[in-house]
Amino acid sequence: MTAVEATPITKEEQSKPLALRVGAELVGSFIICFAIYAICSLGSAVYGINMAFIALLTGIVYAAVTVIFGSISGAQFNPAVSVAAMLTGKTHVLDGILYIIAQVLGGIGAGAAIRFLLPTSEQVTFKIWMTPTVNGFDKNSVSYSTLGNYGVTLGITLAIAVEVVAGIIIVASALRTTDGHGESKTNHAVAMGLAYGNGTAITYPVTGAALNPARATGIAIFAQNQGLNEEPLQQLWVFWICPVLAAAVVALVVIVAGMIGTKKNVPDTVETIDEVEGNTVLGEASVADGNDGEQDEQSYAQANADESVESN
């Protein structure tokens, strides 16, 4: 075996270059956000697809893009997931910050593409496309046109509650299906598809299913000043605070659970050390007894020899 073959390859040596990983987060986020914007705008306005289809398609999009880029960057595609990965040590802080920047730029790029690709006219304004696409609450909720007629609005408290709960599901699924270095396990894509699909079903009637600060930011910028009931950028802070809060909660649970697990392993280690020391003492005692026995035999043989000499 050569020296090269005998040297194990470390995880750091196996990881992809940082530029490649950041590029994967950028392109992956662009594809995800563009697909979701298209589903919500074209699908809702033209075909009137319901929440079930939006939830299903959102989950499929995240799962598919995770399969494509999971082996490169770990397929985070969400600033909340990146924050949790940094807090738990799965991702280096510098890498995580660059991931977040790439994710937001991907969302903005997707928002720009949708803004300039969707057709408009005097009858079909950009507002019609954006109403089911932009994330918001109260008068900007996708349910406002229906519930508003009955004097009911879905306000900020409900928006925060559903976004935090959905964020916890997504972040926990991401951490559970990535290894200690943030790389995807075999079931990562399926888990993320299910998590985002479930999160969409929970949040879409209230907020339009932000779930991802990059997704909310990308479309909010280009929907600003387009005649919506409320300006999207004024409500955008909710869709950053809630996912990051969810990330912090999940990361705290993971860290505390790890500390508890470490403490439980300490007594086992002490017992093992005691057993080893005990076995060592017993072994030394056995060796000593064996040496004493040999010395007794030698003394007995010497005594017999002396008696034989005297007899002669």
What do these predicted ranges mean?
Residues 1-312:
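Membrane-interface helix-loop junctions and terminal tails of multi-pass membrane proteins
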